[in-house]
A protein has these predicted regions:
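First exposed extracellular module after export/assembly in secreted or surface-exposed proteins
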Residues: 29-182
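Enrichment for repetitive, rod-forming helical segments
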Residues: 9-12, 159-161
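Bacterial Sec-dependent N-terminal signal peptides
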Residues: 3-6, 12-43, 182
Length: 182
């Protein structure tokens, strides 16, 4: 899994170095047609605690994923099982949405670039309010020959009640391999 993620990130970096922007490609007829081909709803699985959980990814002018299981994020904050269970009861999952800002086409793959997503929630555990802020970076790749979508959402910052949690070394990452059109 780590190898796939590393390759995915390297390809995205390579794409960024080539400097393709949606403003130029999407306005061209072929680029617009490819972008239209990508639009739609896809179904894939995010693995949490070795259990695949079904998720939907929607691509329009925005990128949206729902539901996004919160256990990996909340488990970093609430290390006591009872507290974690209470936190998960109040917010089981979320929908993330962000605008698509760029598109690049390289060797049969389309890379969609989006703004980072900021998720904020107030969760009460044991009668105490916890203000949580998580910043996530979505990375998306669409295979032009198979029409399969691969996404990786990496939590880049995690804060609860002004306390920062380590997500740089001990990463929180959501990975969906080969989501298919619904």
């Amino acid at each position: 899994m780590k190898i796939i993620k590393s390759i995915f990130v390297c390809l995205l970096l390579l794409c960024g170095l080539n400097g393709c922007e949606s403003g130029t490609e999407i306005n061209e007829n072929s680029g617009q047609q490819i972008y239209n081909d990508i639009k739609g709803t896809y179904v894939g699985y995010i693995v949490v605690d070795n259990i695949p959980q079904k998720t939907k990814i929607t691509i329009t002018n925005d990128f949206s994923v729902s539901p996004l299981p919160l256990k990996p994020i909340l488990a970093r904050i609430f290390t006591n099982e009872a507290d974690l269970a209470e936190a998960l009861e109040s917010v089981k999952s979320i929908t993330l949405t962000t605008p698509i800002t760029e598109m690049s086409i390289i060797d049969g793959f389309v890379y969609l670039f989006m703004k980072d997503i900021e998720w904020e929630a107030n969760i009460t555990v044991n009668g105490k309010m916890h203000k949580i802020l998580a910043t996530m970076e979505p990375l998306t790749q669409w295979n032009m020959s198979t029409n399969a979508l691969t996404i990786n959402i990496v939590v880049t910052d995690l804060i609860c009640n002004s306390e920062s949690y380590d997500v740089k070394v001990n990463k929180i990452s959501y990975f969906v391999d080969s989501a298919t059109r619904e």
